[in-house]
Amino acid sequence: MHPSRHITLTALLCGAIAAIGLPGCEKKADPVAVAQVADKKAEIPVPGIAEVKAIAEEGFVYGLPLIMNYGVMYEYVLDKNSGQFKAPFNNIYNEHRVFTYEDTAIPTPNSDTPYSLAWLDLRAEPVVISVPAVDPKRYYSVMLNDGNTFNYGYIGSRATGSEAGDYLIVGPRWKGETPPGIKKVFNSTTDFSLAAFRTQLIDAKDMPNVEAVQAGYKIRPLSAFLNQPAPPAAPEVAWPKFDKELVKTEFFDYLDLALQFAPAGPEEEAIRAKLASIGIGPGKKFAFKDLSLEHKAAILLGMKEGDKKV
């Protein structure tokens, strides 16, 4: 590392360590050298401080959609006291009203299409979404949004028509064949996915008609759709509480969890390898929590730089 960069990084690390209220630079020790000695002693094969900071910066930008998505899922599905809770996984919740400014989990919801929402757990088996026949004059849609925040498919009047139909939603690890009766298969890149239904409200007196359409929306595991025995349930997950303040310091702990359910695509292999090198995600050789204080301070600095880019 160039001497001037070393001095600058040392000063930044000391500032970051002091900011989180921990000792580290009061004896004028070189935090970069201290980290190298600590990692060697602990046999942790972590990159150098400067590289760790760069990985954290890139990883923050890459991982932010996953963490924001987890925050919405936590409020809608996992925390019954969130004030935004809708329903457990693989259950549909119908809103018999339009969204207002008080509905804060999603930044910009529509105000003229009452929502029906379902968060899908696709780990054990695919899920079938069934829609009724809808008057062609009435707009409706089902937007499929995965943990990467990719919109990977639409069902509805403009995309698939207004006729009744059954649609298969599959996770990234599913290898089965399309069963009879399925109109189309949609592939999520993550194990968990949001299905957001929108049904047009024509005027204030139209809500009973909207509710009748909503009553026709169904979600079933594939085994139930086929009248077959269900496969073994997916393992329970120890979901961490989502807290916007904690995210500021524990962002990569949340990302480490989220990456378990988001297999890397070919275009993600490079950043995933970098994250694994600092103890985050599949393929890691040590736990993120085992990093030295100096490396964690470098990660905080990298996060701040990444935040400036988004």
Model-inferred region functions:
Residues 20-24:
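C-terminal motif of bacterial Sec signal peptides marking the signal peptidase cleavage site
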Residues 14-19:
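Core hydrophobic alpha-helical transmembrane segments of single-pass membrane proteins
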Residues 27-310:
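A compositional/structural signature for long, glycine/proline-rich flexible linkers
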Residues 2-12:
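Bacterial N-terminal signal peptides that target proteins for export
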